[in-house]
Amino acid sequence: VTYLQGKTDDLNRYDLWEYNLASKENKILVDSQSLFSGTEVLSNEEKARRERQRIYGFGIMEYHFSADGSALLFPLNGDLYYYHIDTKVSKRLTQTDAFETDAKFSPQGNFVSYIRNENIFVLNIATREEVQLTKDGGSNNIKNKGVLPLLRKTLLGYL
């Protein structure tokens, strides 16, 4: 069982933990401060998104499992990170000034998709090659037509 827990010295900064049902032990999987120790600076869009979702903490605030359960994907300070369960290694997938949001694994787990500056991107996890699928996000086309239907349609043809 995995869960988010605030640090003992800062309850508003969350780390990713695991509870082992067999051994009945808790252990930290990802220490958010080991990946990013500074003060998180949120974009206005991210502040609004967190406010709508009533999220008031920092650190790792959400995470997603790959379909086969072998990896986790999570945002931290606007960038995306990948954590492999077996190797226990985290790696930064993106490093930009803009925030990557709405990150998801592809069904096969070899790509991640996300939104940056209102455009859809896909990143190959192994090669870290990034492909920008849309270029008109600033014209409100994506916002008005809905991200999810467009993302599904685009990814089905791409992957």
Where are these regions (language model features)?
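Beta-propeller folds
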Residues: 1-159
